[in-house]
Amino acid sequence: MAITRWFFSTNHKDIGTLYLVFGAWAGMVGTALSLLIRAELSQPGALLGDDQIYNVIVTAHAFVMIFFMVMPIMIGGFGNWLIPLMIGAPDMAFPRMNNMSFWLLPPSFLLLLSSSGVEAGAGTGWTVYPPLAGNLAHAGASVDLTIFSLHLAGISSILGAINFITTIINMKPPAISQYQTPLFVWAVLVTAVLLLLSLPVLAAGITMLLTDRNLNTTFFDPAGGGDPILYQHLFWFFSHPEVYILILPGFGMISHIVAYYSGKKEPFGYMGMVWAMMAIGLLGFIVWAHHMFTVGMDVDTRAYFTSATMIIAIPTGVKVFSWLATLHGGSIKWETPLLWALGFIFLFTVGGLTGIVLANSSLDIVLHDTYYVVAHFHYVLSMGAVFAIMGAFVHWFPLFTGYTLHSTWTKIHFGIMFIGVNLTFFPQHFLGLAGMPRRYSDYPDAYTLWNTVSSIGSLVSLVAVIMFLFILWEAFAAKREVASIELTSTNVEWLHGCPPPYHTFEEPAFVQVQAN
């Protein structure tokens, strides 16, 4: 019975749970890889061996965290669990395809881990640029296995995106317009559209790289009339939307958390929030070359990409100030999810400010491939996406399980994690401004102090991760059941109790919309 339930599931709640468990496991693998990186960099001199093994670890860390931790948890886990409940749908539009979307991920993960285990591993960085990723600099099957891994993860995401778009547009009650759905639903809708439009470009780029490596084509080889810069354009046309794919569901979750713990019926500026997400989604597609300021673009091209990148700060600012306006005048409940949300707003804004710095092509020429860039994207991912995930998990855990997490320990966990990530990544701004380059396993001893501080911070974060596992165990051991839920009229996912029954909305929901 258990085998058929979990392997052949067509239930959105079960598949969401599978995604959450898989993402948590992958997150621990990715954390272990990051600790190896920080151990290597904690002092000058070699620890793990040569630069190849170091860069294999860096590459695997990036792929694991992006494709097997953040995306499965945010989109697969919370998306599957919450979206049918939030729109009153009995399940996803294509339940069996939903199951396939999940079960493509473990084989994909296996291929990625295999790529590290054969030959010398894929030490290309997650960008997999040729000619380093070509069949001379990376002979053997490692890069090919990485490419196949990305193909499977990409198919999984495309199928999931089709499923979410269809579900959200088609499975609402007839009386509900798209502009009456919760913000998390909007966030996942925009995310799904971004995935659907950007992933095929990545698939094309890495397939061309595969044929360059194995079938003697020369798409990226100047000797045969190709151009390695073409690969960069294809890769970043996917990977810039990808970073918005990683953060947009987080925006949606933060909107729900901030409104709920401010005691508000709805977030401030609902329509502004929706249009801001759509604007971010659109602008995310027309700024990709800001990752390529150092390849020798025309000055007018650089001027355009600088300006377009800065424009994204406007809808992002709309969202940040709307969250602050939602908090304003609220009856604030100081519970752990709100702490994660407040941490998110502050740290995501800091990461956004360093992003504005890097948007300037002239400054980016100097800062490109330094630790300043690493600090920037870890502020928006390690403290944006991850804080959103943690806040959402603590907020919706009672819905998923029927049990409550320990309120004091989750607050302590937040405090340790907050100190850990800031201690890890704030010093990296200094290293970058001092010119320390990325993706090197060793450094001159002038950089020792801040690298040591950063590595100590990573150990603090490790303590937080271990404490989180303890908090989970404690909740399931203590079995504190949920007493009551407030504000269910505007938080419809809670209407069926905690946890909700296996099948919800088996009959269509009756929705009466008041005329304004």
UniProtKB/Swiss-Prot annotation:
<comment type="pathway">
    <text>Energy metabolism; oxidative phosphorylation.</text>
</comment>
<feature type="topological domain" description="Mitochondrial intermembrane">
    <location>
        <begin position="213"/>
        <end position="227"/>
    </location>
</feature>
<keyword id="KW-0106">Calcium</keyword>
<dbReference type="Pfam" id="PF00115">
    <property type="entry name" value="COX1"/>
</dbReference>
<feature type="binding site">
    <location>
        <position position="45"/>
    </location>
    <ligand>
        <name>Na(+)</name>
    </ligand>
</feature>
<feature type="transmembrane region" description="Helical; Name=XI">
    <location>
        <begin position="407"/>
        <end position="433"/>
    </location>
</feature>
<keyword id="KW-0460">Magnesium</keyword>
<feature type="binding site">
    <location>
        <position position="240"/>
    </location>
    <ligand>
        <name>Cu cation</name>
    </ligand>
</feature>
<keyword id="KW-0249">Electron transport</keyword>
<keyword id="KW-0496">Mitochondrion</keyword>
<feature type="binding site">
    <location>
        <position position="441"/>
    </location>
    <ligand>
        <name>Na(+)</name>
    </ligand>
</feature>
<feature type="topological domain" description="Mitochondrial intermembrane">
    <location>
        <begin position="118"/>
        <end position="140"/>
    </location>
</feature>
<dbReference type="InterPro" id="IPR000883">
    <property type="entry name" value="Cyt_C_Oxase_1"/>
</dbReference>
<feature type="transmembrane region" description="Helical; Name=IX">
    <location>
        <begin position="336"/>
        <end position="357"/>
    </location>
</feature>
<dbReference type="GO" id="GO:0005743">
    <property type="term" value="C:mitochondrial inner membrane"/>
</dbReference>
<dbReference type="GO" id="GO:0020037">
    <property type="term" value="F:heme binding"/>
</dbReference>
<dbReference type="GO" id="GO:0004129">
    <property type="term" value="F:cytochrome-c oxidase activity"/>
</dbReference>
<comment type="subunit">
    <text>Component of the cytochrome c oxidase (complex IV, CIV), a multisubunit enzyme composed of 14 subunits. The complex is composed of a catalytic core of 3 subunits MT-CO1, MT-CO2 and MT-CO3, encoded in the mitochondrial DNA, and 11 supernumerary subunits COX4I, COX5A, COX5B, COX6A, COX6B, COX6C, COX7A, COX7B, COX7C, COX8 and NDUFA4, which are encoded in the nuclear genome.</text>
</comment>
<keyword id="KW-0679">Respiratory chain</keyword>
<feature type="binding site">
    <location>
        <position position="368"/>
    </location>
    <ligand>
        <name>Mg(2+)</name>
    </ligand>
</feature>
<feature type="binding site">
    <location>
        <position position="40"/>
    </location>
    <ligand>
        <name>Na(+)</name>
    </ligand>
</feature>
<keyword id="KW-0915">Sodium</keyword>
<keyword id="KW-0999">Mitochondrion inner membrane</keyword>
<keyword id="KW-0479">Metal-binding</keyword>
<feature type="topological domain" description="Mitochondrial matrix">
    <location>
        <begin position="401"/>
        <end position="406"/>
    </location>
</feature>
<feature type="transmembrane region" description="Helical; Name=XII">
    <location>
        <begin position="447"/>
        <end position="478"/>
    </location>
</feature>
<feature type="transmembrane region" description="Helical; Name=VI">
    <location>
        <begin position="228"/>
        <end position="261"/>
    </location>
</feature>
<keyword id="KW-0408">Iron</keyword>
<feature type="topological domain" description="Mitochondrial intermembrane">
    <location>
        <begin position="358"/>
        <end position="370"/>
    </location>
</feature>
<keyword id="KW-1278">Translocase</keyword>
<feature type="topological domain" description="Mitochondrial matrix">
    <location>
        <begin position="262"/>
        <end position="269"/>
    </location>
</feature>
<feature type="binding site">
    <location>
        <position position="290"/>
    </location>
    <ligand>
        <name>Cu cation</name>
    </ligand>
</feature>
<feature type="topological domain" description="Mitochondrial matrix">
    <location>
        <begin position="171"/>
        <end position="182"/>
    </location>
</feature>
<feature type="binding site">
    <location>
        <position position="291"/>
    </location>
    <ligand>
        <name>Cu cation</name>
    </ligand>
</feature>
<dbReference type="InterPro" id="IPR033944">
    <property type="entry name" value="Cyt_c_oxase_su1_dom"/>
</dbReference>
<feature type="topological domain" description="Mitochondrial matrix">
    <location>
        <begin position="87"/>
        <end position="94"/>
    </location>
</feature>
<feature type="topological domain" description="Mitochondrial intermembrane">
    <location>
        <begin position="434"/>
        <end position="446"/>
    </location>
</feature>
<feature type="topological domain" description="Mitochondrial matrix">
    <location>
        <begin position="1"/>
        <end position="11"/>
    </location>
</feature>
<feature type="binding site" description="axial binding residue">
    <location>
        <position position="376"/>
    </location>
    <ligand>
        <name>heme a3</name>
    </ligand>
</feature>
<comment type="function">
    <text>Component of the cytochrome c oxidase, the last enzyme in the mitochondrial electron transport chain which drives oxidative phosphorylation. The respiratory chain contains 3 multisubunit complexes succinate dehydrogenase (complex II, CII), ubiquinol-cytochrome c oxidoreductase (cytochrome b-c1 complex, complex III, CIII) and cytochrome c oxidase (complex IV, CIV), that cooperate to transfer electrons derived from NADH and succinate to molecular oxygen, creating an electrochemical gradient over the inner membrane that drives transmembrane transport and the ATP synthase.</text>
</comment>
<keyword id="KW-1133">Transmembrane helix</keyword>
<protein>
    <recommendedName>
        <fullName>Cytochrome c oxidase subunit 1</fullName>
        <ecNumber>7.1.1.9</ecNumber>
    </recommendedName>
</protein>
